[in-house]
Curated annotation (Swiss-Prot):
Designated name of the protein: Peptide chain release factor 2
Residue numbers carrying N5-methylglutamine: Q254
GO terms assigned for molecular function: translation release factor activity, codon specific
Lineage top rank: taxon: Bacteria
Organism: Variovorax paradoxus (strain S110)
SUPFAM superfamilies: Release factor
InterPro entries, A to Z: PCRF, Pep_chain_release_fac_I, Pep_chain_release_fac_I_sf, PrfB
UniProt keyword Protein biosynthesis present: yes
Keyword set, alphabetical order: Cytoplasm, Methylation, Protein biosynthesis
Pfam families: PCRF, RF-1
Length: 367
């Protein structure tokens, strides 16, 4: 190992340390570490299992936090130790030690790249589970077979990622394959990883269903959307609510007109206004007004989610055969993404679920 190689190890460690520091800031390490301590304390409470749903939610949150906090702790510690060892090994001329440090640095960089990749998830729904709809297009039996190949491809991809899958719906083809299917994919960032797969996938091959061995072109559409949690917890930040009091009008005797017992609440972010003047005291009117505000915000959230779901459905109908995103030409051993121009020749690996090169390129280019 010459002097240039030795110096390069030091430069690599410095670069990795700087990237790790950037990740700590970007991923809000301090806040996540504090939240992880709170979640761990909650999970250690035996009473948490009295509410299995809450316990499961805490378990999922812990895993997500661990992925960031524990990884950053390991990176920070590993880089600090290796930097110290590097200076000692360099001074002592310990070539074996320097090689070991170089190997450790390569392993640490792999973890850093995974965290840096997570920075590309900028959609609020990215961390959620996903549904993958597969629909056979034009091409009859050949298209149905192609749809079944894609079903297998995404199941294999999910398996590679350690995701849990369930086929929610499957319609068999008349002769072979499937007319359509829906897969539920459960795991951290399942939607974020799969969302760029939405579009039309085109297959060109010599059909096994054509005795003459003719070349056939088939299509299938993929539509990926997030699983929206049905539970809606309305949390109102008091700072977002303006409270006004005024003298009530109407029935209630003389008392109701002599004091500012009526209460009006304005939820500033949404513009929703509620008021109550039925009670004889400001305290009771305030309680009722807050209950009404929560109800209004619940309704507002439900309507917003319905609108978002409708947008998803509308975008689904827009996926026509002209919206091709990827071409699989098996005869020529070529699969090409038409948006990123990424092209691979290992067609069987892709059909076996090795989609990382396509998905990463799509996320990096903001497809």
């Amino acid at each position: 190992m010459d002097a240039e190689q030795i110096n390069q190890i030091g430069a690599t460690l410095a670069d990795l340390s700087a990237r790790t520091a950037d990740l700590r800031r970007y991923l809000d390490y301090d806040a996540k570490a504090e939240r992880l301590r709170t979640v761990n304390a909650s999970l250690e409470d035996p009473n948490v299992w009295n509410d299995p749903k809450k316990a499961q939610e805490l378990g999922r949150e812990k895993k997500s936090l661990d992925d960031v906090v524990v990884t950053l702790d390991r990176l920070t510690s590993g880089l600090s130790d290796n930097t110290e060892l590097y200076e000692m090994s360099k001074e002592d001329g310990d070539m074996d030690g320097l090689q070991s440090i170089a190997d450790d640095a390569a392993a640490l960089e792999t973890d850093i790249k995974q965290l840096e990749f997570r920075r590309m998830f900028n959609n609020p729904a990215d961390p959620l589970n996903a549904f993958v709809d597969i629909q056979a297009g034009a091409g009859g039996t050949e298209a149905c077979d192609w749809a079944s190949m894609l079903l297998r491809q995404y199941l294999k991809y999910a398996e590679r990622k350690g995701f849990k899958t369930q086929i929610e719906d499957e319609t068999p083809g008349d002769t072979a394959g499937i007319k359509g299917a829906t897969i539920k994919v459960e795991g951290d960032y399942a939607f974020g990883l799969l969302r760029t797969e939405t579009g039309v996938h085109r297959l060109v091959r010599k059909s096994p269903f054509d005795s003459s061995g003719g070349r056939h072109t088939s299509f299938a559409s993929i539509f990926v959307y997030p699983e929206i949690d049905d539970s809606i917890e309305i949390e109102i930040n008091p700072a977002d609510v303006r409270t006004d009091t005024f003298r009530a009008s109407g029935a209630g005797g003389q008392h109701i007109n002599k004091t500012d017992s009526a209460v009006r609440l304005t939820h500033i972010p949404t513009g929703i206004v509620v008021q109550c003047q039925d009670g004889r005291s400001q305290h009771s009117n305030r309680d009722v007004a807050w209950k009404r505000l929560r109800s209004r915000l619940y309704d507002h959230e439900m309507r917003k989610r319905q609108e978002e779901q409708q947008k998803l459905e509308d975008s689904k109908t827009d996926v026509g055969w002209g919206h091709q995103i990827r071409s699989y030409v098996l005869d020529n051993s070529r699969i090409k993404d038409l948006r990123t121009n990424v092209e691979v020749s290992a067609t069987q690996k892709v059909l076996d679920g090795d989609l990382d090169v396509f998905i990463e390129a799509s996320l990096k280019q903001g497809v």
